[in-house]
Amino acid sequence: GHIFFSDNWFGFDDGIYGAARFADIFSGQEKPLSALPGWPKTAKTPEIHMPCPDEIKFEVVKRAQAYFRNKYTVSEIDGVRVIRPDGWGLIRASNTQPALILRFEAETENAMNELRKDMEAPLKGWIAELGGKS
């Protein structure tokens, strides 16, 4: 992941500056860092590479944007990100290989698997329809 601070800095991600800012923020706290609540527990996939020929991958993403826009709240920055109350899924065209890149995260394993199934099924159909292998 990345973290950006736009105040008191140039507004790009910088790991060393991020660590220094966190140290500065927490140095003013009376409680130790161990008193902070833990990270939320979620189910998530690693980055999934779905084979998709270069010639059709951007058309597949375009179809995904139109399709999922009618079903869910979506963000179309760099692909399509489906946003649900219990999780999210991302589809984007790889810039370096003939593949679509997918990621899924949800509050539970079942919710993540449901979203993944819902998003992968039409992708496979569009890839086959446009001349790729599914």
Regions found by a protein language model. Give the residues of each.
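Phosphate-binding and adjacent anionic-ligand microenvironments
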Residues: 1-103, 108-134
